[in-house]
């Protein structure tokens, strides 16, 4: 029989703009910050009892190489005896880390774990593959910030290798999502995030980051990506994929930096370490879709999860849907029978306003859902997101 698994604490860094306040911080140092914050916030815990640290990270081609989870836990001050593993489900890596920890504890294999994710897209390197032959002049430099690199010709022939904005336009075309609706969705995200920031909502989940530089140091304590915009300003932006398309920089998520970490524990570990159970993890489900419309992935993932749990989408008091693109966000909501402007969906804005540090975002969605449930007294929360190469992931929690 599966055991109950609890989220006991959750913290993250601010989300930095591309080239912004966190751009000089290495990914391993960035990932260590929320782990260290968890240690400081929970002095009653015997940290030598942590069974594993699970961190999501999508890139792993630069300073986040060689198992960034292990690097981060050591840099954070956890004992050398604690193992760590880095998971990669691209955009959903941080959520997958939470789900993997949940399953390990629920099965009885583990009692106490840290899970989360990290991404420094500002510091993503350029990489070059090795030559296929001596004196080759066909060397190619690849940008690892986001999207395809070192493309497999068979993959391209069978499925296509559309860039992320193209997949979003594919969804807009297939599901008839207009430019006007996308821009309205994007504006709502910005407005809700601005209101949440003004109310201090995100301060509860953020650990400020001190960034050293030549002139001293800077304290980064707020998410940097939100923009003050209008429908008129959004309407003036040119489509990324040509005049007849609808996806723009304004109705898409950002390229960002950030890290997050959560404590997950069994009921026994909660008592043993003096923790407070804040939410119960109910389950996680994944699903695959055509890579060319990867943005629709949350639909089958959510349907699979709610069927498994015996719930309906209407049972959730808050839904954190990752806003990779407004087009896919709207298509997902409509397929699930949810209104475009439903108040329970991203009530504090989403990735269009906050940003989308790939490996961190899934963990951010879960903790933001938790904080919203605690703020409003709601019971059940759902976090879901699309994944590059055609997948969806969904995870449900219940406040205790």
Regions found by a protein language model. Give the residues of each.
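N-terminal extracellular/periplasmic Venus flytrap/periplasmic-binding protein-like
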Residues: 12-13, 23-24, 28-33, 44, ...
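Conserved active-site "lid/cap" helical segment
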Residues: 1-76, 167-179, 196, 289, ...
